[in-house]
C-alpha cells in the first residue's frame, strides 16, 4: 500500500527503465465537438491514468502499432527498421490480458513466429487494472475473461491510497526503496455483467445459410471501426511507399486492416470472396465465436464490448451472438 505521492515516485523510478503506457484522457479528441477520448498513451504520473472509464481503443496499439515500418529499401539494399529497445510497462484490464493470448496465437503460434511482433512482445510487462464494476456493453463474464492471474503487477487506486500486488522481481526491486505498508492485496474482478451472451453448443457452419445476415447488408456501413477497437483483431495489409525525391527508394509498412472494409478479400482479376456486408459480418462473427475455438480451444472474442461502443449504426455484436441459436433453428427447420 502506497499513497499517491509515493506511487508517483515509484512511477518515476520505473520510467527510467520502462516506457509506461496506460489509458489516459485525450482532451478534445472525441467523436463529437468538445468531447474527450480515452485511449492509450505514455504516462508519467498516476493522476494521468484513467481508471474509471473503459478506453475507446484497446492496449493493442502499444504492441501492435497501427502503422509499422518493417524495412527500408533501395535499388541495391534492404535494411530492417530499428525498433525501440526499451521495455514497456502496460496497464490493462483482465479481458485484455486474455486477448493477449489470442494475439500471441496468431503471431507466435500459428505456423511461424512474426519477428516484428515478437520483438515488441518480449519486452512488454503488464499491470492489471481491476474492475470493481462492469462497464456498458461488457460481456466478459459470459466469455470467461473476467478473471486472470497472468499479470506482472496489479494496481488499485482507492482515494489517496494505491494498492499493489507485484509478482515481477525486477519491478519489485526497482521500487523497493519506496516507502510502503505491507498488506494482503487481492485483485477486483467483475462477477456479473448487464449483458450476457449465449453461444449455442450446436453452432455449426450451417448457420451461414440463415437469413439473419441479410439485415447487415443494409445496416452496416463497412467503416471498420469495430475491428480497429477490438483487442483480438489481428489482420493487416502491406504498403510499399516510395519517396518523391527518389522513386527507387522507399519502405514497406504493415498497416491494420479490416475484414469489413471493401477490398479486404479482393484478388487478381477483380474477384472477391465476400462482397455483401452481411457476408462480412457473418465471417467476423463466426471467426470470433466458432472457428477460432475449433483450432485453439477457446473463443477469440473476450467480451470487452468495444465493438458495440464504437459502432455508428448501433449494431450490437452481443445481440448478433445471441441471435445465433435462433438462426440455427431456422436453418434446421428449413432443411
Residue ranges and their predicted role:
Residues 1-204:
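Iron-sulfur-associated redox domains of electron-transfer enzymes in respiratory
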Amino acid at each position: 500500500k502506497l499513497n499517491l505521492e509515493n506511487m508517483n515516485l515509484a512511477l518515476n523510478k520505473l520510467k527510467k527503465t520502462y516506457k509506461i503506457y496506460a489509458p489516459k484522457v485525450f482532451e478534445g479528441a472525441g467523436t463529437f465537438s468538445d468531447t474527450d477520448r480515452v485511449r492509450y498513451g505514455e504516462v508519467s504520473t498516476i493522476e494521468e491514468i484513467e481508471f474509471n472509464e473503459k478506453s475507446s481503443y484497446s492496449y493493442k496499439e502499444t504492441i501492435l502499432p497501427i502503422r509499422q515500418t518493417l524495412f527500408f529499401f533501395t535499388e541495391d539494399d534492404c535494411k530492417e527498421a530499428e525498433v525501440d529497445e526499451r521495455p514497456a510497462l502496460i496497464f490493462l484490464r483482465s479481458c485484455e490480458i486474455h486477448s493477449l493470448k489470442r494475439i500471441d496465437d496468431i503471431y507466435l503460434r500459428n505456423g511461424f513466429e512474426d519477428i516484428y511482433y515478437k520483438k515488441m512482445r518480449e519486452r512488454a510487462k503488464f499491470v492489471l487494472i481491476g474492475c470493481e464494476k462492469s462497464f456498458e456493453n461488457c460481456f466478459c463474464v459470459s466469455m470467461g475473461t473476467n478473471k486472470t492471474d497472468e499479470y506482472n503487477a496489479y494496481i488499485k487506486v482507492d482515494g489517496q491510497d494505491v494498492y499493489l500486488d507485484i509478482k515481477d522481481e525486477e519491478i519489485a526491486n526497482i521500487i523497493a526503496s519506496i516507502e510502503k505498508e505491507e498488506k494482503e492485496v487481492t485483485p477486483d474482478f467483475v462477477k456479473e455483467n448487464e449483458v450476457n451472451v449465449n453461444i449455442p453448443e450446436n453452432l455449426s457452419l450451417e448457420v451461414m445459410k440463415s437469413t439473419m445476415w441479410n439485415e447487415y447488408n443494409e445496416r452496416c456501413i463497412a467503416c471498420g471501426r469495430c475491428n480497429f477497437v477490438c483487442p483480438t483483431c489481428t489482420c493487416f495489409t502491406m504498403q510499399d511507399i516510395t519517396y518523391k525525391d527518389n522513386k527507387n527508394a522507399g519502405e514497406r509498412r504493415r498497416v491494420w486492416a479490416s475484414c469489413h472494409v471493401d477490398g479486404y478479400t479482393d484478388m487478381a482479376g477483380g474477384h472477391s470472396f465476400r462482397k455483401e456486408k452481411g457476408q462480412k459480418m457473418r465471417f467476423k462473427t463466426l471467426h470470433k465465436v466458432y472457428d477460432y475455438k475449433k483450432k485453439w480451444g477457446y473463443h477469440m472474442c473476450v467480451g470487452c464490448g468495444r465493438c458495440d461502443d464504437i459502432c455508428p449504426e448501433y449494431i450490437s455484436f452481443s445481440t448478433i451472438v445471441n441471435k445465433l441459436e435462433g438462426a440455427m433453428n431456422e436453418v434446421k427447420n428449413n432443411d
